[in-house]
Regions:
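Glycine-rich, flexible beta-strand/loop modules in the N-terminal catalytic cores of phosphate-handling
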Residues: 34-120, 125-132, 197, 201-214, ...
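Mobile "lid/hinge" segments at catalytic clefts and subdomain interfaces of large enzymes
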Residues: 152-285
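Glycine-rich anion/phosphate-binding loop at the beta-strand->alpha-helix junction
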Residues: 30, 49, 103, 113-167, ...
């Protein structure tokens, strides 16, 4: 798009023999009433637009950060018109729901803890090349719009997919290239000093991976996957630098937002002193249900003991007890090398699988991992 108010920047990713991919960011023309908005292009073929808005007043009665991420697919993005009786866009498909979750996971922890203003990030798929996945592009679009919005957000965040194809890690692989992959990872992260901090990884092996490996394809061993994470860092850095350029030109100053911490340091100190050594017996209970019941009893006891000192702050005291429990549990695992259920840090829960558990239906299965 062109115009006097349009600003853009781009990142070029070199995949060697697989060619180059160009991600371009653009802002200043669409959704000017939103706190922040941005267009993200992948090779000028696939386009995702993202808009970020925030409420002016906090939701004080919430004990969580009310962030909503939505991805809206448009039929015209693929050159189609809805063919049903109601010529409207339907409910989000599976791919859109998974893309929204992929965005939420790295962006949510980047907001300052204790924020209670409602934030909505809406991504719209405007155009899509049939050979390009749009989900990781949407991560970058959402990060760009949120970074421009003047919110307490420690971005920008870059996202890419890395696929192991013919022994090489390829960024932003096409669908046709993924048919030759033995492993792929969606990775998101941000630049921290001279390094890139990985914030989210979603990895999987394609259904045909065994066929490719048996035909001589590279096996995704632990060391090979680690190489893939390292290969993603220059890509994420390039994406973050392109976003940072636009933030410097068009970003709003961070507004004054109130924060509501789960508990105060004074409350945590008081809770820790009140608990004393009473957490150790709780850590020794192997059965999860019994352990939870014992922790609830301990929490109620501590809250009652401190009620006079901290009136009408039962919820914050309970959160402080939970924080003290997590800290003690982590210390116990690191020092003793044993988790609460008796497993070592490298042991997994018992896994069982059974097929044909229901009568009459064509197929049924039961998969269990420990008590889950």
């Amino acid at each position: 798009m062109e115009g006097p108010d349009v600003h853009s920047s781009e990142a070029v990713i070199d995949n060697g023999s697989f060619g180059k991919r160009t991600v371009r960011f653009e802002t200043g023309l669409l959704a000017r009433q939103a706190n922040g908005s941005a267009l993200a292009y992948l090779d000028e073929e696939t386009t995702v637009f993202a808009a970020t808005t925030a409420s002016k007043a906090p939701k004080e009665h919430f004990d969580f950060f009310p962030l909503t991420v939505d991805i809206e697919e448009r039929s015209y993005a693929a050159g189609r018109i809805p063919g049903s009786f109601f010529r409207r866009e339907g409910r989000p498909g599976t791919e859109a729901i998974l893309a929204a979750r992929l965005i939420d996971r790295p962006l949510r922890p980047a907001f300052t803890k204790g924020m209670r203003n409602e934030v909505q990030i809406v991504g719209t798929v405007l155009t899509v090349h049939p050979d390009d996945p749009y989900d990781v592009l949407a991560i970058n679009a959402a990060s760009m719009s949120t970074s421009l919005a003047g919110l307490p957000f420690s971005g920008p965040i870059g996202g890419t997919r890395m696929a192991l194809i013919d022994g090489q890690w390829v960024a932003f692989p096409r669908w046709s290239e993924l048919t030759r992959a033995t492993f792929s990872m969606a990775i998101a992260g941000r630049v921290v000093g001279d390094d890139v901090a990985v914030m989210m990884v979603e990895a999987k092996a394609p259904e045909h991976a065994d066929i490719v490996i048996n035909a001589g394809g590279a096996k995704p061993t632990e060391s090979v996957v680690a190489e893939g994470l390292e290969a993603a860092k220059p890509v994420i850095r390039a994406l973050c630098e392109a976003q940072a350029k636009l933030i410097g030109e068009c970003g709003k100053p961070v507004g004054d937002f109130p924060f509501f911490p789960d508990y105060t340091e004074e409350q945590l100190e008081a809770v820790t002193e009140s608990i004393g050594d009473r957490l150790q017996p709780v850590l020794g209970i192997v059965a999860k249900a019994e352990r939870d019941e014992a922790l609830n009893d301990l929490t109620a006891s501590v809250v009652e003991e401190l009620a006079e000192r901290f009136p009408e702050e039962e919820g914050m005291l309970a959160a402080a007890v939970n924080a003290a429990f997590k800290k003690t549990m982590r210390h116990h695992v690191l020092t003793e090398g044993v988790r609460m259920d008796g497993r070592t840090p490298v042991e997994i829960r018992t896994i069982t699988a059974e097929a044909g558990v229901l009568p009459r239906v064509h197929g049924s299965a039961l998969f269990q991992r420990g008590e889950t």
